[in-house]
């Protein structure tokens, strides 16, 4: 696939990620039985799942940008494999938001565009930094999901099942990236990533 075809494919991915209904390749983790949740609990859970959905929108864009500029075919293949699992996460989060009567972030086009740009830059820095960025991203997402497991209503088993499976997948992505030669990022870069993620989470929980 030449560079123009890749750009067209990325544009198509952006449209599908932001505006279409994604389809998971794996079964939905949540139990078919819905728990009895108060309106306040449902709204709270929906806001948390909206933040998680934004994270998956960003993951689609980030991996697309990284794959576009990756120099090694094996690295590109690994990024594309991770992106396929993130599509499952995207679909699960959207389904759970719908079940809770919530809505997706209104800023999803902005999130996608920003994350794609970051992914392109990460790829241009070279494969060891590209994979290192992937590993650090997944570590931070894993920690974020662990925090959401503490915040979700105790009775909301369906949301918890989704988040727990996502957490397992993110940890595996980080391990694979390191095994393929991902470098540890400098502390200032890790801090900047956490700061940007905090801004995204605070904004997405409301808008």
From Swiss-Prot:
It is found in: Cell membrane. Its cofactor is Fe cation. Gene3D superfamilies: 1.20.1260.10. Fe cation 1 binds at residues 56, 86, 89, 170. Its main location: membrane. Keywords: Cell membrane, Iron, Membrane, Metal-binding, Monooxygenase, Oxidoreductase, Ubiquinone biosynthesis. One of its GO terms (cellular component) is plasma membrane. SUPFAM superfamilies: Ferritin-like. Binds 2 iron ions per subunit. One of its GO terms (molecular function) is metal ion binding. Belongs to the COQ7 family. This is 3-demethoxyubiquinol 3-hydroxylase.
């Amino acid at each position: 696939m030449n560079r123009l075809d890749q750009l067209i494919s990325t544009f198509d991915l952006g449209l599908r990620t932001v505006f279409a209904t994604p389809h998971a390749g794996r079964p939905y983790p949540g139990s078919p039985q819905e728990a009895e949740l108060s309106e306040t609990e449902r709204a709270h859970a929906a806001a948390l799942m909206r933040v998680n959905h934004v994270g998956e929108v960003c993951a689609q864009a980030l991996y697309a940008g990284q794959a576009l500029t990756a120099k090694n075919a094996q690295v590109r293949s690994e990024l594309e494999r991770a992106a396929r699992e993130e599509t499952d996460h995207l679909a699960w989060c959207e389904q759970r938001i719908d079940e809770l009567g919530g809505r997706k972030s209104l800023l999803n086009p902005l999130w996608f565009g920003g994350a794609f740009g970051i992914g392109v830059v990460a790829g241009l820095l070279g494969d060891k930094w590209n994979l290192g960025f992937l590993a650090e991203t997944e570590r931070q997402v894993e920690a974020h999901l662990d925090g959401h497991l503490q915040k979700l209503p105790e009775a909301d088993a369906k949301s918890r099942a989704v988040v727990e499976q996502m957490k397992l997948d993110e940890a595996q992505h980080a391990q694979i990236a390191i095994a393929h030669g991902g470098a540890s990022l400098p502390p200032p870069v890790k801090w900047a990533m956490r700061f940007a993620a905090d801004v995204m989470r605070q904004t997405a929980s409301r808008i």
